UniProtKB/Swiss-Prot annotation:
It comes from Cupriavidus metallidurans (strain ATCC 43123 / DSM 2839 / NBRC 102507 / CH34). It comes from the Bacteria. Its EC number is 2.7.11.33, 2.7.4.28. It catalyses: [pyruvate, water dikinase] + ADP = [pyruvate, water dikinase]-phosphate + AMP + H(+); [pyruvate, water dikinase]-phosphate + phosphate + H(+) = [pyruvate, water dikinase] + diphosphate. The keyword Kinase applies. Bifunctional serine/threonine kinase and phosphorylase involved in the regulation of the phosphoenolpyruvate synthase (PEPS) by catalyzing its phosphorylation/dephosphorylation. ADP binds at residues 150-157. The keyword Aminoacyl-tRNA synthetase does not apply. Keywords: Kinase, Nucleotide-binding, Serine/threonine-protein kinase, Transferase. One of its GO terms (molecular function) is phosphotransferase activity, phosphate group as acceptor. This is Putative phosphoenolpyruvate synthase regulatory protein.
């Protein structure tokens, strides 16, 4: 198992996201060590000490993902006995040449920009999604950017919160239940906002596994019931002309990206 250090002068979210995408391409395990707020040369030297310690203990160079903007800190990290993947320098220096413009080299610039109207929008979106989780409220649905529907435990809540936190989208979600299937139509409260609705489905076998973790041995979790609910929900969405996807083999990120493409909402990524 190789050790991976994620070194940043801020929260490290950017570096960690990038490292996850890169390392996922390799079928091996990595031990991740997160080192946020390395925002001075002194802290960089401390980081180098820990990186070198891993090298001597393991006998192989650690892999280091960095997003440091301070030149002195960068110099210090580059002296470490490791493979250095400097994300900012890889992209910023070529862009400076192409644009004929020096970058600000400001620590946390991205997150400083977010502390404005966009940040306020994101907080409002999170509060909205929490208030409209699992059909808790029908109020202000006209303000929703998207309304997710699907059977219980098909991934609606985590997807709604991801859309709110990552994109500032006001995402409501509503469970489709046996009463809806008996009527053969969407809940009446949703019809006025049909253009905002997107459906989630799931493989019945996977659904019964998830539900058994919550209510083991119950009718709610029985595979026959799960198969019935999924079939009815999918039939309803087809009849109503609602776009939908199966969440069975998709990550939250993949589901959210598909929803953004299909619903055609326009919000900034944080």
């Amino acid at each position: 198992m190789r050790t991976v250090f994620i070194v940043s002068d801020g929260t490290g979210i950017t570096a960690e996201t990038f490292s996850h995408s890169i390392l996922a391409q390799f079928e091996m395990r990595f031990r991740k060590v997160r080192m946020p707020f390395v925002d001075t040369p002194d802290k960089a030297h401390v980081a180098v000490g820990k990186i070198n310690e891993a090298f001597y203990n393991e006998g192989v160079p650690p892999i280091v993902f960095t997003t440091l903007v301070n030149a002195e800190s960068n110099k210090a990290i580059r002296r470490a006995k490791a493979m250095i993947l400097d994300m900012f320098q890889t992209f910023i220096e070529p862009l400076e040449k192409e644009l004929g413009l020096k970058s600000t080299h400001a620590i946390g610039r991205f997150h400083q920009n977010a502390d404005t109207e966009a940040y306020k929008n994101r907080i409002e979106a999170i509060n909205f999604s929490l208030a409209h989780d699992d059909g808790q409220s029908h109020k202000n649905l006209e303000d929703a950017d998207v309304i997710l529907v699907g059977v219980s435990r098909s991934g609606k809540t985590p997807t709604s919160l991801y859309l709110a936190m990552q994109y500032g989208l006001k995402a409501a979600n509503y469970p489709l239940i046996p009463d809806d299937f008996e009527r053969g139509r969407l809940p009446s409260a949703l019809y006025a906002y049909k253009q905002k609705i997107f459906g989630l489905s799931i493989d019945p076998q996977r659904l019964t596994e998830i539900r058994n973790e919550r209510r083991p041995g119950s009718k709610y979790a029985a595979v026959e019931n799960c198969r019935y609910e999924v079939n009815e929900a999918e039939s309803m969405m087809r009849r109503e002309g609602i776009k939908w996807l199966s969440s069975t083999h998709k990550s939250i990120e993949e589901i959210a990206t598909t929803i953004l493409q299909e619903i055609k909402v326009d919000r900034d990524n944080y």
